[in-house]
Amino acid sequence: MKAGAVRIGWFLGVFFGALAAQAQENGGWECSQAKIRSAQNARLAARAAYPGDTLIDMKYLKLDLTIRPENKYIQGAARHIFTAKSGISEVSLDLTGQLKVSSVTSKGRKLTYSQASNKLKVSLPAKLNTGDSETIDVMYEGTPPTTAFGSFSFGTHGTAKAPVIWSLSEPYGAPDWWPCKDDPADKLDSTQVSITMDKSYVSVSNGTLMSVEINLAANTKTYVWKNRYPISHYLVSVACSNYASYDLTWEYGGKTMPVSNFVYPEVLTQSVKTQIDRTVDMLTFFSDTFGEYPFITEKYGHAMCGFGGGMEHQTVTSLGGFSESLIAHELAHQWFGDKITCKTWADIFMNEAFASYSEALWAEKRTGKSAYMSNINGHITRAKTVTEPVYISNPKDENLVFDYNLTYGKGAVVLHMLRGVLGDAAFFDVLKGFMASEYAYKSATINDFREFAEKRSGKELKYFFDQWVYGTGFPVYKINWLSAGANQLKIEAGQTGTKLFRMPMEVKITFKDGKEELRTITIDKATNVFEINDLTGGEVSEVTFDPNGWIMKTMTVGKLELLGNEPAADEKWAYPNPVNDILTIKVPENGLYELEIRDIRGGKVDLREVTKGKVDVSRLPAGKYFLRVLTAEKAVNGVFVKE
């Protein structure tokens, strides 16, 4: 193109900003670290049994464990009651090959079985038809596999090196210590776990403590715990050490529930007690927000274990410390993860996104909106770095399932944005309603939640989940606005990228007298033009887009100015205005400039190439036009009127 020429371009450009942020250690971060270790991930994924035997429906587990920490050995007796989902003569349970089965019986009758490739296959005493039930007892023993993931671990704590034993089965670790059906969707109706150890130990599991049996001859104690609520296999847990007890009581809706905390003696200081005390207020807040605590007839509590972070075992969280955000995160899991569990590990959003978002809700409750936004903005910064969808493409990759930036961070941001789309009243009604829905004490997929949210709120949300949960990326907005006279505002909002996003965006309009008005526009195309002619505050002085930060995005905003009706050639850079035929563009020196012109509806105006800053606009229809001239240093915006 010739020197001094003016070329026609697009009105909208894309400007990307780079943001750097440090990952903050919060409850979600601690939770993710507890659930993922890189050293053994490939090995664990290779032997993952998921989704277990699809032809049976598990009903009941009675698990009797004897644990010998001195040689890291366990002996187990697992009674399973299950029903057949079709005609079967054989059942398959998932159990590591490092634990050897010594017998399998049914009502005292020995059954034929084989153990290979981390599977226990049992021939049933008779063929089962659909709906028939059966009971089998599996006797096994051995040393659980030692993995960095820590499905069943032996450790010590304190200067005295007191032993501590704990389980952490999520996602694929339960077969490392008991024979099970390795599928989070198939919940047991109830469980009983008995733990026998040296009498110096306190042993903790799910539900209510039924008895403590002392065997003086063997110098042992047996703790018997009964859980009467549906429970996913990976939430069955044990934790054993020389715990000191710190017991609280929570009252809600006329009901009383124990909050039982099992803490290392050397850790149980007044400061730690103060941290734990927050649990009671959190129980009330989350019950008000999501519905009554799901296991109120049993308990809630914590058991300290030898890992950093936490694990939301049903009714008793296992954790390594008592930070406020970790307590909030794991408690929220009792609703999102335990009461309603992800149906597949690809749907881990149903667990971790909600628990991470609940941290922000608790921060908002405790400290205010600024604390909430600080939490969310941290997640937004990290979420912008991810390239995978929130719906997990490879659920056998624990690095991906428990990726903090993705599953926890972006997951929380998705819920924040959904709150913005629905509004507070509808959003929290959806959450509380979902907890009381057909999925209560069962499992659900992300799509189940979407369909429920649509039905409950009356809003179509497929577009939202498609782009934010099943898709990747985020919108990049370039927005310009013009105060077009009293009570009039014109906005041109564009987005670029490999895909376009559809999102409602709040617009805060500030008038010269200081009054404000809030409107909402929906940006869903590459170029969007909005003319607002029914304002009530007079002349607009400022416009703020997405003032409450509901959208994960990058955005640049510019203000257009009217060029004036009586321009002087030495004062104005584009004149005359209004113009009939030739518009003069005043530039500081010869060179290459980009001239961008669009009509007020956002359509690109096609002009011939011109020189010497003269633009022939005689063929343009009468009306207002956006004008922009770009130099190497800056861009100058304006509006001219064609008569």
Give the ranges of each region predicted by the language model.
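Glycine/proline-rich low-complexity spacer/linker segments in large multi-domain proteins
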Residues: 53, 130, 139-191, 249, ...
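Amphipathic alpha-helical substructures
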Residues: 404-491
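Zinc-dependent metallopeptidase catalytic helix centered on the HExxH motif
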Residues: 317-373, 431
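Hydrophobic helix-coil surface modules that form long, contiguous segments used
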Residues: 76, 167-171, 181-328, 357
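Acidic/His/Gly-enriched intrinsically disordered linker/tail segments
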Residues: 352-417, 421, 439
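C-terminal outer-membrane/trafficking sorting elements
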Residues: 19, 568-575, 579-643
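A surface-exposed beta-strand-loop module
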Residues: 24-30, 96-157, 531-537, 550
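N-terminal, polar/Ser/Thr-rich
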Residues: 23-75, 159-163, 462-463, 467
